[in-house]
């Protein structure tokens, strides 16, 4: 049974590039007109994949060809969404996601490509608030220090036993933040003390939940520093990095720079560096599903060949994160959720509702995401 995917981000990018050559954007057209334009593009170029498969001699039942935006499949997507929502497996929440500043959308973990790049490890001096000295932290992203809300050390690190619970002064920002202890911190990395920026790192975000730390967003959707960045507001993240490093050095907070190679996450479509960002998204709870998948292999109902890959499979399944399914684009299956601004009711429906079942209001607003 042959078929093609609507490729939401990739297709929207191509059509937006066409519009850019005409000197307009999708926002100039509006959502409905833009989607019409995408369908026009699909009608013109969408058959290329099928024609290639036919030329390759693929033996398919071509009368059963499907496209993921066909009416039947669109109904199926809504059906699955509603069922999972009713079962408590789909929810909306503020969480840290992989944000592409170029595509202006969240993407899943599987849509992030990692490339090793040479960079630096900056060692920065954070003075103790009581004047008893300072603690050195190492970071590959000094620009994110604007959103620091703690410095963390390993609870088993003898070097910092008497420092846990103290406060330090965040350089350049002059904000007091605590020194906390967490098992996540690797004693061998840098000085053994790390800055915690919950709004810009998934691991820091998780640590903030464990220690009830404040989350301070420092960038907008374009990866430009926002008002929380003080004098750095309006600077893109890389310009801000240069200026932060310069100011740290001038004010005596920068104590060392070491060459450092690390993996940088990039958008799988446009290759822009991903910016971890806290935003409101729709998620699928995967832990209950992962438990069933693990049980299937343990019981022998599913076999992994070769069996040496079972350890990798179990590692992935036991350390899995909830799946972000919403995208801030226009081309795709729109989230089947409507909001009533009169009473606040959230309506999840297989069909487009014409009025609020709670208060009868006929003016409903559908979720913008796909």
What are these regions (language model features)?
Residues 1-2:
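RNase H-like polynucleotidyl transferase catalytic core
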Residues 157-158, 267, 358:
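Serine-centered coil/turn micro-motif
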Residues 343-370:
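Glycine-rich (often Gly-Gly/Gly-Pro-rich) flexible segments and glycine-rich loop motifs
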